[in-house]
A protein has these predicted regions:
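Conserved glycine-rich cofactor-binding loop
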Residues: 13, 20-21, 44
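Active-site helix of classical SDR
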Residues: 128, 164, 172
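Alpha-helical segment proximal to the catalytic Tyr-Lys
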Residues: 133, 177-181, 240
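Short C-terminal tail/terminal secondary-structure segment
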Residues: 2-5, 102, 153, 232, ...
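C-terminal substrate-recognition "lid" of short-chain dehydrogenase/reductases
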Residues: 86, 125, 140, 220-249, ...
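Residue(s) in the substrate-gating loop at a strand-loop-helix junction
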Residues: 148
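Substrate-binding pocket helix/loop in short-chain dehydrogenase/reductase
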Residues: 103-105, 109-114, 212
Length: 259
């Protein structure tokens, strides 16, 4: 029998890091549109509040909390405020990431690499350990890490970022083994090139963009909403049997292979 509410998130509370723009903003908006109460988080509160305003104007419910993924105490506060506001956390989306270096590995400074790994990997482990016990107690939860197809290939421009995203995929598999027995579904999304401010150095480069579009089966780069829908799937009943996986949403770059 068809279940018309397979993607319904009514009654659920979702916390989204990096939620003020790009992919994160789309995830916030899409989850709110499907009924979730959303905690929009990023470093800058005004940007989060703008997203919240848009959600509320469309009849959704959301609140803004400023937090930097580089500071564990700020993430602890994010989780605490979310619980104080909505009494629970059902969905945790780790979308925020940093990539302060664009260039060859020969020029990568050690402290920059350490920052990338802490922000893009360690922060996700912190958040899982913060929200996991509550989800385990309820025997229900969804934990989503936004990775990248860069995790699955090499890069001459953003190798350190790609390494961190590969580590996230390994983290997802290990967390799934640890928390899956509590009915917590832990998965990753690996977007291809998406037209966001974060990836502007790539899509705004005519040569890189043309190369990406020529490789993609769909012959285009992605938009934030192309990823927001995947997150809704993983957070909803539609994704109830998906755990420890990475969903590639890249327009067919990897799947199409070389021509």
């Amino acid at each position: 029998m068809t279940n018309p509410k397979m993607f319904d998130l009514s009654g659920k509370v979702a916390v989204v890091t990096g939620g003020s723009r790009g992919i994160g903003r789309s995830i916030c908006e899409q989850m709110a549109a499907h009924g979730a109460k959303v905690v929009v988080s990023s470093r800058k509160l005004p940007a989060c509040e703008e997203v919240v305003k848009g959600i509320k104007e469309k009849g959704g419910e959301a609140t803004a909390v400023a937090a930097s993924i580089s500071e564990k105490a700020q993430l602890e506060n994010l989780v605490a405020v979310a619980r104080k506001t909505y009494c629970r956390i059902d969905i945790m989306v780790c979308n925020a990431a940093s990539n302060p270096y664009f260039g060859p590995l020969t020029g990568l400074k050690e402290e920059v690499f350490q920052k990338i790994m802490q922000n893009n990997v360690m922060s996700n482990l912190w958040l899982m350990n913060m929200v996991g016990p509550e989800m385990a107690e309820r025997k229900d939860g969804a934990f989503i890490i936004v990775s990248s197809i860069g995790a699955l290939m090499g890069s001459a421009h953003i190798a350190a970022y790609c390494m961190s995203k590969a580590a996230d995929l390994s983290l997802v598999k290990s967390l799934a083994m640890e928390w899956g027995k509590h009915n917590i579904r832990i998965n990753a999304i690996a977007p291809g090139l998406i037209q966001t401010d974060f990836a502007k150095a790539l899509w705004d480069n005519p040569d890189i963009r043309k190369a990406n579009e020529s490789k993609a089966a769909l012959k285009r780069i992605g938009q934030p909403d192309d990823i927001g829908g995947v997150a809704v799937f993983l957070a909803s009943k539609a994704g109830a049997f998906v755990c420890g996986q990475c969903i590639i949403a890249d327009g067919g770059v990897i799947g199409a292979g070389a021509e």
